[in-house]
Amino acid sequence: MSFQIEYYTSAENKNDFIVEFTNFPKVLYADNNKINKLPFEIESLYFKLHHLTHDFFLIKENGVVVLRSMICLTPFPDLAYFGLLDFDYKNVKVKNILSEFKKMINSWCQIQGASKIYGPINFSTWLPYRLLSSVDGGPMFSFEPDRPIEYCQLLKEVGFTTNQLFSSKGYEELDTIINLYQSDYEKALELGFTFEFFPKELDLVDMKDLHRLSLKFFDDNYLATPIDFDTFRTLYASQSKKDDFTFSLFIKSSDGERIGYFINFIEHDYCVAKTIGIDKNYRGKGLSNGSMYLSLKKAADMGISKTVMAMVKEGAQSESYGRKMKHLWVHLYEILELSIA
């Protein structure tokens, strides 16, 4: 069985390669409106993003693309990522296709000196990453990986293993947690802390504070890397076109300094709790609980009775919020890994 691999770095006509690479998911999922198919102008930007050694490649059978992906080195020693992965998962030869993918990964990583590869991660965890691996009820949300669940299953069947597990969990009975955390909110006010809801559109000062705090909060997060301000602002602007962030808020110290935030929004009649971050010098004062109280109360006052604890690393402290409410459903996601032979 013969497959052909084409690399961007060795392509004679790089513009044609970019068009073919970005067009593949549009062709593969032409009849599936649940799959996010980015316009060429957006996806082609990936070819200008990464400053470390990387490449893009296509696997073809008889001249027809059956898989696309990128591969890159990372700031972490001996570690590479694969990402932007799409493949013809319904193809009767799909395991042969993925075996060729593994072979290509092994060869590239051996040449570059990487001993392990994680993915899918589109260059960094600031950009889309993870695969959907399990759905136990509940609606699908815009922040979730949208590739078919078969991707994760099939990659495992050819030798990839779970590196890290994440979950989104749906709950109802918001009143329980609102009542429970009201005292934390009131205590925070007594200590001089204040909470400031996001405006409809963040100005330059707001964005710089959000960027500054994010770099500080995520520095110790799994696979965290820095992000420059312009890229951060572009990503936020793109997301804010889809989601209403006016339920989100900044947390301010008694001297008016922004020292934390709680990012959340409404989707499918759920209040989606996305990210809570507090400066480590102010932790242990109930500020996370206080911000949860204020945002969830605002949602409840509008008739929202359910919440999602979104994209949480399994075993993280933030999982504890859900133990106070009635559990409805869970969606699981994974980062996969492959040791280089």
Regions picked out by a protein language model, each given a short descriptive name:
Residues 2-9, 145-220:
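Acyltransferase donor/substrate-recognition loop-hinge adjacent to the catalytic core
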Residues 18-61, 66-78, 202-278:
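A conserved beta-strand-loop-helix scaffold within acyl/acetyltransferase catalytic domains
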Residues 77-92, 127-139:
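Surface-exposed, active-site-proximal loop segments in enzymatic domains
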Residues 83-95, 122-125, 275-284:
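A short, internal acetyl-CoA/4′-phosphopantetheine-binding micro-motif in the GNAT/acyltransferase core
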Residues 93-107, 278, 284-297:
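Conserved acetyl-CoA-binding loop-helix of GNAT-fold acetyltransferases
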Residues 104-122, 126, 154-160:
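Non-catalytic accessory segments adjacent to catalytic cores
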Residues 124-177, 247, 261-266, 272-280, ...:
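Active-site/acyl-donor-binding loops of N-acyltransferases
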